[in-house]
Amino acid sequence: MSNSNIHTTAVIAEGAKLGKNVKIGPYCIIGPEVVLHDNVELKSHVVIEGITEIGENTVIYPFASIGQPPQILKYANERSSTIIGSNNTIREYVTVQAGSQGGGMMTRVGNNNLFMVGVHIGHDCKIGNNVVFANYVSLAGHIGVGDYAIIGGLSAVHQYARIGEYSMIGGLSPVGADVIPFGLVSSKRAVLEGLNLIGMNRKGFDKVKSLSALKAIEEIFSGEGNFAERIKQVAEKYNNNSIVIQIIDFLNQDSSRAFCRFEK
């Protein structure tokens, strides 16, 4: 515990091993079989328990939970472990759970990784180096992730899947199979199915104008001619419909993104 900076409200169990220059913030809880290597920093409210090792220069943000038992019914309190390498950034509410008897008794994370808010790494996962998991990525058990892989926010990966090196998974993607190295995987994006007619009715919009606006967007997104011409034609045709005019104004504004594709 040489030169370590430990807040007075932190709870560190007897037996925990701390390296040099470890910083432990307010209300952190450290179990008796935890090893924190040199220059590890726990911001506050971090819970690390079980047989867990955190590599040097790793920074863990508030409310992260590392080394808790796996979420499986057949877990029988076996002495499994969680090993996290060096130079990792583990943001708020990340959970990394210990291994199980059916997966080698260890969950392992490599070096130089970024795990954004709310990431879940399930039991027996093996994560490589230099990966990026965006917000709320969820990995089930027994998943292997290769070096330099990127997983977009709110994506979920099925148990036992393999994510190859240098691959990328787009946001909101349910991944139920292996992803090859260098592969690009993405789920179907949200599509425009019509107008929020029920919500518009509840807010007092005129029903006739709302239905007319629905017809107008069908003409804009699936009519003949190019998109700009269709917008102009619809603006002229429905110039007395305030709902359509509001939509047209939105379509004519500058944007760095495309519009959601229309599917009736």
From Swiss-Prot:
GO biological process, one term: lipid A biosynthetic process
UniProt superkingdom: Bacteria
InterPro entries in the record: Acetyltransf_C, Acetyltransf_C_sf, Hexapep, Hexapep_transf_CS, Lipid_A_LpxA, Trimer_LpxA-like_sf
GO cellular-component term (any): cytoplasm
EC numbers: 2.3.1.129
Record's keyword terms, sorted: Acyltransferase, Cytoplasm, Lipid A biosynthesis, Lipid biosynthesis, Lipid metabolism, Repeat, Transferase
Compartments reported by the entry: Cytoplasm
Catalysed reactions, semicolon-separated: a (3R)-hydroxyacyl-[ACP] + UDP-N-acetyl-alpha-D-glucosamine = a UDP-3-O-[(3R)-3-hydroxyacyl]-N-acetyl-alpha-D-glucosamine + holo-[ACP]
Pathway linked to the protein: Glycolipid biosynthesis; lipid IV(A) biosynthesis; lipid IV(A) from (3R)-3-hydroxytetradecanoyl-[acyl-carrier-protein] and UDP-N-acetyl-alpha-D-glucosamine: step 1/6
Protein role: Involved in the biosynthesis of lipid A, a phosphorylated glycolipid that anchors the lipopolysaccharide to the outer membrane of the cell.
Family: Belongs to the transferase hexapeptide repeat family. LpxA subfamily.
Protein's UniProt name: Acyl-[acyl-carrier-protein]--UDP-N-acetylglucosamine O-acyltransferase
Organism: Rickettsia africae (strain ESF-5)
